[in-house]
């Protein structure tokens, strides 16, 4: 799914339901489920899934102005539907370093990163699905539902 409705957004919130549906992945295989792109198709927001020691795990990340990534910790999810929400915010001005990324799974905040120097970043397009770096050992079908995005307010389940 591609969402072209964002328009150089300094803040972007997205919520959707995700079910791994027993997708086959080799241990430590990972790929990206969501990318948020700027106006020239550089990814600046991402959500990654991996399979580790028999568990599915998710982590979110925001790109800074030096092209580095601020990653959340990996959070284990069960093989069932989950409600996922992300709140990405660009820094307010150059030098403020007050950009942030918050991440919820099933209504519980699992990560919050702040102090990100990303004042030059803006969200222009979102892709949701198996968007990048799918390993050869990954096979099957997972499910997404009820995607919603906003500029500011919490969306919830």
Task: State the predicted function of each range.
Residues 41-45, 67-73, 108-114:
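Surface-exposed loop/edge segments in extracytoplasmic proteins
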Residues 60-83, 92:
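Short, aromatic/His-centered strand-loop micro-motif at the edge of beta-sheets
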């Amino acid at each position: 799914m591609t969402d072209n409705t964002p328009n150089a957004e300094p803040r972007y919130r997205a919520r959707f339901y995700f079910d791994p549906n027993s997708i086959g992945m080799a241990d430590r295989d990972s790929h990206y489920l969501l990318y948020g792109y700027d106006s020239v198709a550089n990814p600046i927001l991402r959500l990654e899934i991996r399979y580790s020691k028999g568990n599915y795990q998710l982590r979110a990340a925001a790109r800074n102005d030096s092209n580095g990534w601020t990653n959340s910790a990996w959070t284990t999810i069960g093989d069932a539907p989950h409600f996922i929400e992300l709140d990405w915010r660009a820094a307010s001005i150059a030098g403020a370093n007050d950009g942030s990324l918050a991440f919820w799974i099933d209504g519980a905040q699992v990560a919050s990163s702040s102090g990100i120097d990303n004042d030059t970043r803006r969200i222009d397009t979102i892709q949701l699905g198996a968007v990048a770096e799918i390993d050869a050992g990954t096979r099957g079908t997972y499910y997404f539902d009820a995607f919603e995005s906003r500029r500011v307010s919490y969306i919830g389940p």
